[in-house]
Amino acid sequence: MEPHKGLFLPYGTGCLLVKNACHLEQAHKVAAKYLPPFQEESDRIDFCGISPELSRDFRGLRVWLPFKLFGTQTFAAYLDEKLDLCQYAFKQIQALEQIEILAEPTLSTFAFRYRPRDCSPGDELNSLNQRFLTEVNRTKRFLLSATYLGDEFTIRICVLAFRTHQRHIDDCVEEVRRVTRLFNDGSLTN
């Protein structure tokens, strides 16, 4: 599990759910004089034999405790809100002129780019969108990211921060709209 992505938990938080612990031992257990095994009949877990780490950081506690304190309904409600916000952001961005959607929402992420009418795909359009992204992120009120889909530089919106709500999406869309206007009138394209 990677709960930092959809469960709003810190990086490095995680757990591995296994059905058969002997598979972990087959993959990780090593014999060395400086790592003597526990007694075979012991009920103690030999962490050296089930993990590449030689100690236990207990990352699973960082998953279990928030669920114990807040319940699964809280996490489900927040995640549902973020999925809805992604769809909302997608519809708002899709409605903007000279914005081209390159990847529709997958869970909480979608990709788009600025596409002026007189610019065909290629290095020039990629460079233009890199500048577009820099300008959108300049306010430091939100952080859009980038990726390449094939050879095309794209701008991504990923809605996963637990403090992100509709007003933040509205502000982000307004900033994309503002930068689009500046690029369209030539203020930022050179």
Show the residue positions of the predicted features.
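Short beta-strand
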Residues: E100-P105, L144-Y148
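Short, hydrophobic beta-strand segments
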Residues: L65-P66, A111-P116, I155-L160
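PLP-dependent enzyme catalytic core of the Aspartate aminotransferase-like
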Residues: A146-N190
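Active-site C-terminal subdomain of aminotransferase-like
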Residues: M1-Q94
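A generic structural motif
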Residues: K5, L69-T72, P116-D118, A161-H165
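Non-catalytic, mobile gating and regulatory segments of ester bond hydrolases
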Residues: Q94, I99-E100, C172-E175
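Short amphipathic beta-strand starts and helix->beta connectors
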Residues: A95-Q98, R138-L143
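Conserved PLP-binding catalytic core of the aspartate aminotransferase-like
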Residues: I101-V136
